[in-house]
UniProtKB/Swiss-Prot annotation:
InterPro entries noted in UniProt: MJ1316, UPF0248
Family listed: Belongs to the UPF0248 family.
Name of the protein in its database record: UPF0248 protein TON_0940
Domain of life: Archaea
Record-linked HAMAP family: UPF0248
Pfam families membership: MJ1316
NCBIfam families, A to Z: PRK04257.1 (NF003272)
Amino acid sequence: MRKGSVKEVLAKLKYDPREDERDYYIIIEHRGAYGDVKKIPVELIELGHGYFFVGDAQIPYHRIRRVVKKDGKVIWETRKDRRGESD
């Protein structure tokens, strides 16, 4: 699993030419969705200072639970998810 903030991990996936952002997605906390989580491809997000954007929607970084490669490998997750806790 990669180290650093989720914003740093996403910036690397989006801007590092060695990575293909199409190979990754994020899982966000999204109340009302099935299981209160939503899956978003990294290629659809734009990074901001305290938020990221999906179309016109502005979403705070703290809503991101995991960053996952399409093969299922978790490359970043919140500390509470690493401990096996869930909300």
